[in-house]
């Protein structure tokens, strides 16, 4: 078994050029959204408040709250870290790095700065095995196989697989000052939660993290983005269901890849301005339905990804210098 292969360039640069040619007003949407910082502050405060609340609550309530509340908060914070990676909270690099570290505080596992480094490579080299850490490793795909149990375990342990996978990308140094700072802060926060509030609060934060990207409707978001679940060779998919209201429009993934320097609260306007470019693309309407399809359809596996041998089409980005951080110009981050 192997991934699917394409000799064509990744699909987004070409579409971006076409959209800007026909709809130059899209450029007015480019730029950060500083009000995002207050959403981050609210989510961080809420997650720690719930963690404190469950300190002396029964285990069943802790699990229930982690699944129904904590998972959405943790997922929202992941989306906010993603915004920081693209410098979409503030314009300058340092405030976005620091804001990403704040968003990481309740997330149990340090990953804010590492995500920024590897995610920008994903945009610049979509589908290139040695540069795109979003592509599962071959050993990972072989280990998980096609069984529902294997795929369920993979989703449940996704943070671990993602962390190990990143070492495959030799172009990105795994350790640096900011990454180590992120690790040190997170260890300190986790120890403080355990010492001050006890093991149940600690467990709540851990469960919220794993539910947010695992066996939960939100976990299907990791499948929705680039897994080939339909006919044809479309390799990026958007989600237009109602949960976008609770997940900061993260489902608008084609739109995001076409314009990675447009903030989350303006992504729906891309499709509204240029509907002819998106109406014919396959899209998902239900993360829950997608989750079950991925788990129980034996034709779907970690091999259901499109790869390419070179980052065809690399070069200056068509949407202009304001978006440079989302490209190979990401070396500035």
Language-model features, listed with the residues they occupy:
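Transmembrane alpha-helical segments that form the membrane-embedded catalytic/substrate-channel core
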Residues: 71-81, 111-113, 159-163, 206-232, ...
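Histidine-centered catalytic micro-motifs
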Residues: 77-86, 115-127, 221-230, 246-262, ...
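Non-catalytic, topology-defining segments of multipass membrane proteins
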Residues: 1-71, 105-204, 265-266, 271-333
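Short, function-defining helix-loop hinge/capping sites that tune catalysis or transport
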Residues: 52, 90-91, 131, 234, ...
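Membrane-interface elements of multi-pass transporters and channels
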Residues: 57-61, 84-92, 122, 168, ...
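Membrane-cytosol interface motif
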Residues: 97, 101-105, 234-247
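Aspartate-rich (DDxxD/NDxxD/DxxxD) Mg2+/diphosphate-binding motifs
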Residues: 83-99, 131, 136
């Amino acid at each position: 078994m192997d991934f699917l292969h394409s000799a064509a360039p990744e699909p987004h640069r070409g579409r971006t050029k076409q959209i800007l040619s026909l709809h130059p007003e899209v450029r007015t949407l480019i730029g950060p959204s500083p009000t995002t910082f207050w959403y981050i502050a609210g989510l961080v405060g809420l997650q720690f408040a719930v963690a404190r609340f469950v300190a002396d609550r029964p285990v069943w309530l802790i699990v229930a709250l982690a699944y129904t509340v904590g998972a959405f908060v943790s997922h929202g914070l992941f989306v906010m870290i993603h915004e920081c990676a693209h410098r979409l909270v503030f314009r300058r690099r340092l405030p976005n790095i620091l804001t990403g570290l704040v968003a990481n505080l309740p997330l149990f596992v340090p990953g804010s700065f590492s995500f920024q480094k590897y995610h920008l490579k994903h945009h610049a080299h979509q589908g290139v095995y040695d540069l795109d850490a979003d592509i599962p490793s071959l050993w990972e795909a072989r280990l998980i196989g096609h069984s529902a149990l294997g795929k369920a375990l993979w989703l449940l342990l996704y943070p671990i697989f993602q962390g190990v996978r990143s070492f495959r990308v030799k172009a990105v140094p795994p350790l640096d000052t900011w990454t180590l700072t992120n690790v040190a802060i997170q260890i300190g926060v986790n120890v403080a939660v355990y010492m001050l509030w006890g093991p149940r609060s600690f467990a709540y934060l851990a469960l919220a993290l794993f539910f947010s990207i695992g066996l939960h409707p939100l976990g299907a978001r990791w499948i929705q983005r680039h897994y080939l679940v339909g006919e044809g060779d479309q390799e990026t998919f958007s989600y237009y269901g109602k949960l976008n209201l609770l997940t900061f429009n993260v489902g608008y993934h084609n739109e995001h890849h076409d314009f990675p320097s447009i903030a989350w609260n303006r992504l729906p306007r891309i499709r509204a301005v240029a509907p002819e470019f998106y109406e014919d693309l396959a899209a998902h309407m239900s993360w829950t339905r997608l989750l079950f399809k991925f788990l129980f359809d034996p034709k779907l596996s970690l091999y259901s990804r499109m790869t390419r041998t070179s980052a065809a089409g690399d070069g200056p980005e068509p949407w202009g210098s304001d978006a440079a951080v989302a490209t190979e110009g990401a070396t500035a981050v």
